[in-house]
Swiss-Prot record:
GO molecular function, one term: thiamine pyrophosphate binding
Species: Helicobacter pylori (strain G27)
Gene that specifies this protein: dxs
SUPFAM superfamilies per the UniProt record, alphabetical: Thiamin diphosphate-binding fold (THDP-binding), TK C-terminal domain-like
Organism phylogeny: Bacteria, Pseudomonadati, Campylobacterota, Epsilonproteobacteria, Campylobacterales
Gene3D superfamilies recorded: 3.40.50.920, 3.40.50.970
Binding-site list for Mg(2+): 142, 171
EC number(s) given by UniProt: 2.2.1.7
Protein name: 1-deoxy-D-xylulose-5-phosphate synthase
Length: 618
């Protein structure tokens, strides 16, 4: 447990004192996020809600569960991390999300959306079985109500009536504008006036009526429900209170007191302003959701924009270019149009763009149906979020061999977001699925060719991956070439050992190749390109070389080296193969270069490892 290193007086009866605490927390959040980067606007918008929670509840007896948890900065500051908050998202510093190994006050790991109510239901069930005092309190926000798991949890909660408080932090935005009929309908319902006290008075009056008019009274009550903003939740058996002003501490405190006394499932609807307290961010939701270091006075980024396109930009530009000529191309994303680059397709062809909200499983299944109808759906998705849709990939796309195209962004180590966001699993779980074609580009130019190949491939689902930020391999080092199904590319033939790169691993292998050349060791270099199917000529390609070294940004177990070893084994070829992939553990947050160095994946460490394997000193 991290001990308290700054004392806050959170007296629920001293609203003025709580407001001063809120200002102190906002100032600290702005100070640190402007220096380190992080999730700014969500955390600023949730300050009063979190202060109210801490003022009334002991979070070790009443677990606080933060949905996604990127809005939990105020919680960290209130639980012994005020001074250490300066290390936010830094290597070996504080995580940007709740993390139980960091603090006993962080109840559950989080990073992906919409899990909080499900976790809360599990806690409530356990508390009932243990006859424990207290109840879980979930803070939801940023579009979590668009995901299926939220409604799955509500379904059980409303039926079982477990004591639980849910606070819906409604800032009318997820990461970008919320999508879907449910979000829109709930948003409209929730913009009405505060009905709770009026409804209580109506119920009181109805209870005094004689039994002879009970039927009419009950009909009036049912009719009244239809005009209240909480009808959706109350029909599920969940008490609804709100809307309230999520920045009014008096309203927050009184509402939490009421919810606490009910000892039933309660949803408090709180309306907040994303970016509250920082005028530059207020009203500019998507730009200020997740930010890099910026100047606090001007709001301008401290990092100049690179002249080199990011992989995401290279992908989206190519897709837009193809979409102009091919009306069958459609773009699909799960609440990440800007992050995946599909915002360009929205502007150019709005009818051919589909943001399905935070519903990855639906994204994959509906795309499979579009593919069956002759369209070419490019599902643009982060590697970490694709894992939420695994069954849809298997059941709905691959069994029927429907030609969806998975454009897997943020593949590999992603840096400051850490364990919950690393893109390290897709290689292992996708290559185990029949009918799936898997390939990876080595730089922006071959990424463009990968998009073109995917567009033409119509016999099965296919997937290609690319990193966040930039490729390791610089532009123009090797001539770009088109993709041919199952064909690798030998970039350098001469040498006694062979370095095999897959995707971004080609750039890493090339840097090692140059470092070894300075030691008078010549290495051949192979761009594997296709992981599935592997090049049928691979056994002949590797035959001249004494040892093989494999480089790729994914987990080692079930990874690229495993695929190569399986292939060679089936050919009865015994060849030493050493893997430089990711070890079998969840990788922490931090600057990507520092994280890679800690894993021995920087050029110097890789070169030393090969020299040692060859029996030579550096």
């Amino acid at each position: 447990m991290i001990l308290q290193n700054r004392t806050f007086d959170l007296n629920p009866n001293d609203i003025a004192g709580l407001e001063l605490v809120c200002q102190t927390l906002r100032n600290r959040i702005l100070e640190v996020v402007s220096a380190n980067g992080g999730h700014l606007s969500s955390s600023l918008g949730a300050v009063e809600l979190i202060v109210g929670m801490h003022a009334l509840f002991d979070c070790q007896k009443n677990p606080f569960i933060f949905d996604t948890s990127h809005q939990a900065y105020a919680h960290k500051l209130l639980t012994g991390r005020f001074e250490s908050f300066s290390t936010l998202r830094q290597f070996k510093g504080l995580s940007g999300f709740t993390k139980p190994s960091e603090s006993a006050y962080d109840y559950f790991i989080a990073g992906h959306s919409s899990t909080s109510v499900s976790i809360g239901v599990g806690v409530a069930k356990a508390f009932c079985l243990k006859q424990a005092l207290g109840m879980p309190i979930a803070l939801l926000g940023d579009g979590s109500i668009s995901a299926g798991i939220f409604y799955e949890a509500l379904n059980e909660l409303g039926d079982r009536k477990y004591p639980m408080i849910m606070i819906l932090n409604d800032n009318e935005m997820s990461i970008s504008t919320p999508i879907g009929a449910l979000s829109k309908a709930l948003s409209q319902l929730m913009k009405g006036p505060f009905y709770q006290s009026f409804r209580s008075k109506v119920k009181k009056i109805l209870s005094t009526l004689p039994e002879s008019v009970n039927y009419l009274a009950s009909r009036f009550e049912e009719s009244f429900k239809l005009i209240t903003p909480g009808v959706f939740f109350e029909e599920l058996g969940i008490n609804y209170i709100g809307p309230i002003n999520g920045h009014d501490l008096s309203a927050i405190i009184e509402t939490l007191k009421l919810a606490k006394e009910l000892k039933e499932p309660v949803l408090i609807h709180a309306q907040t302003l994303k970016g509250k307290g920082y005028k530059i961010a207020e009203g500019r939701y998507e730009k200020w959701h997740g930010v890099g270091p910026f100047d606090l006075d001007t709001g301008l980024s401290k990092k100049s924009k690179s002249a080199i396109l990011s992989p995401t930009e290279a992908y989206s530009n190519t897709l837009l270019e193809l979409a102009k000529k091919d009306e069958k191309i459609v773009g699909v994303t799960a609440a990440m149009p800007s992050g995946t680059g599909l915002d360009k397709l929205i502007d150019a062809y709005p009818l051919r763009f589909f943001d399905v909200a935070i519903a990855e499983q639906h994204a994959l299944t509906s795309s499979s149906a579009m593919a069956k109808e002759g369209f070419k759906p490019f599902v643009s998705i982060y590697s970490t979020f694709l894992q939420r849709a695994y069954d849809s990939i298997v059941h709905d796309a691959c069994i029927s061999s429907l030609p969806i195209k998975l454009a897997i962004d943020r593949a590999g180590i992603v840096g400051e977001d850490g364990e919950t966001h690393q893109g390290l699993l897709d290689v292992s779980y996708l290559r185990s699925i029949p009918n799936m074609v898997i390939f990876a580009p080595r730089d922006n130019e071959t990424l463009k060719n990968a998009v073109r190949f995917a567009n033409e491939h119509d016999s099965s689902p296919c997937a290609f991956r690319y990193p966040r930020g930039s490729f390791v391999l610089k532009e123009g080092v090797f001539e770009p070439s088109g993709f041919v199904l199952g064909q690798s590319e030998l970039l350098k033939k001469e040498g006694e050992i062979l370095l095999i790169g897959y995707g971004n691993g080609v750039g890493r292998a090339h840097l090692v190749q140059l470092a070894l050349k300075e030691k008078n060791i010549e290495c051949a270099l192979l761009d594997l390109r296709f992981l599935k199917p592997l090049d049928p000529n691979l056994s002949a390609i590797v035959a001249p070389y004494q040892k093989l070294y494999v480089f790729s940004d994914n987990y080692k177990l079930g990874g690229v080296a495993s695929a190569i070893l399986e292939f060679l084994s089936e050919q009865n070829i015994l060849k030493p193969v050493k893997s430089f992939e990711i070890i079998d553990e969840f990788i922490m947050h931090g600057n990507t270069a520092l994280v890679e160095k800690s894993l021995g994946l920087d050029t110097e460490s890789l070169t030393d490892a090969i020299l040692k394997d060859l029996g030579q000193e550096r």
